């Protein structure tokens, strides 16, 4: 079992990654709102977050720290960041003329510190010469003889080891932003933007889906060598499609649900499966029915849990489904008459079920045209014996489902 210190480090590391993902998504949203389409964002590429807008590159280092932490001139957060950028600049992996280097930290910047002097120009505190002097002084005064901080100092020293010194150039590209929003504040900001896009009631559900897509997309980018970043065009397409799903006349259909392929054997005792067996539907089609039932049940439950449905909406939808079925069922019973054979009953019952399977495409909302919603909802009704296929479905299944002691 991990000790308390190890658990804390693991939790802090996990929170750091979540903060990184959340900030990257927030950056995409900001770019989408303000920068048109000519941009891209990548995570864990050249830096925590790598942002391109036109020909300009922004490399972001993120540091989430506990309240009250200060970014001093000997802070490991500061020097580890400097090491990353110094090594990249020295190796020619970044073009300092076209690259902005941003350190975003939730820590405070003590007045007069190097970080304080490297705030953006509009802060009116920026003083690159003083920042460089402070960093050199901190490095010189340090008594560190080994460890991570020493290697950070060495990387910074190497910038000025050649005929072309780079320390001053590097410093000129760095901006430090202290007291930046933490993961909670970043998510609150995104939730506010989501509320503006789709309304307050649907904002959480909208943001959850956008986050789900983005995290999957970033994982794909990180797992693939040279993986492509999220582009402005791609993000616009995803966001526009998601907004369309949350319109007044629509409901979202989720990919994890459309991909469900349940085990048919687990539903063998369900009443709607027995209804299909009663009329001789084959095992393959029963499998499709189970799939539609599970998908519809899961999607409807999620809509309900997320308060995306209007009062009485499911009841009204099911009323329409039952009434459409009832007229066809009555017509079937009328055509068969009281003397119909079992073979004739099954034949006509299959026609009713074929109508559900191939034609019944009643939409819960005008824009929600996913087929499994209607088909699966009919199976949900069949499971409750509110609809059926065999002319005698109610009597036969009630007898079958009745406890043995009650017969």
Regions found by a protein language model. Name each.
Residues 13-14, 20-83:
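Catalytic centers of nucleases
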Residues 358-407:
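Hydrophobic, glycine-enriched assembly/anchoring segments
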Residues 2-6, 11-18, 22-29, 376, ...:
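Basic, amphipathic N-terminal segments that precede the first structured/catalytic domain
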Residues 1-11, 64-364:
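Acidic metal-coordinating catalytic centers involved in nucleic-acid phosphodiester chemistry
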């Amino acid at each position: 079992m991990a000790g308390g210190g190890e658990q804390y480090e693991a939790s802090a590391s996990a929170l750091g990654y979540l903060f990184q993902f959340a900030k990257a998504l927030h950056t995409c949203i900001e770019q989408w709102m303000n920068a048109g389409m000519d941009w891209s964002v990548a995570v864990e590429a050249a830096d925590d977050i790598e942002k391109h807008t036109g020909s300009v590159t922004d490399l972001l280092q993120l540091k989430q720290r506990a309240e009250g932490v200060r970014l001093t001139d000997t802070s490991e957060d500061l020097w580890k960041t400097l090491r990353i950028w110094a090594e990249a600049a020295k190796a020619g992996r970044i073009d300092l003329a076209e690259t902005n280097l941003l350190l975003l930290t939730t820590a405070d910047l003590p007045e007069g510190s190097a970080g304080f002097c490297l705030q953006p120009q509009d802060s009116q505190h920026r003083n690159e010469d003083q920042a460089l002097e402070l960093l050199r002084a901190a490095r010189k005064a340090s008594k560190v003889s080994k460890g991570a901080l020493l290697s950070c100092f060495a990387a910074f020293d190497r910038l000025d080891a050649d005929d072309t010194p780079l320390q001053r150039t590097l410093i000129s590209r760095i901006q430090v932003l202290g007291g930046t929003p933490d993961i909670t504040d970043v998510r609150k900001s995104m939730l506010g933007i989501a509320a503006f896009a789709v309304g307050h009631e649907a904002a959480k559900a909208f943001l959850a889906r956008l986050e789900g897509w983005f995290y999957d997309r970033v994982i794909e980018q990180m797992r693939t060598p040279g993986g492509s970043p999220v582009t402005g065009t791609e993000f616009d397409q995803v966001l526009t499609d998601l907004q369309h799903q949350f319109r007044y006349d629509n409901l979202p259909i989720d990919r994890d649900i459309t991909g469900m392929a349940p085990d048919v054997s687990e539903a063998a005792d369900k009443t709607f499966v027995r209804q299909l067996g009663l009329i001789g539907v084959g095992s393959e089609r029963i499998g499709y029915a189970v799939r539609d039932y599970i998908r519809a049940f899961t999607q409807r439950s999620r809509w309900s849990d997320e308060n995306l449905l209007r009062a009485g909406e499911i009841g009204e939808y099911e009323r329409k489904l039952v009434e459409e079925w009832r007229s066809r069922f009555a017509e079937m019973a009328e055509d068969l008459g009281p003397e119909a054979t079992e073979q004739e009953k099954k034949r006509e019952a299959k026609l009713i079920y074929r109508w559900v399977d191939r034609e019944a495409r009643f939409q819960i909302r005008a824009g929600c045209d996913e087929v499994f919603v209607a088909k699966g909802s009919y199976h949900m009704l069949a499971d409750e014996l509110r609809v059926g296929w065999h002319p005698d479905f109610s009597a036969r299944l009630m007898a079958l489902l009745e406890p043995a002691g009650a017969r």
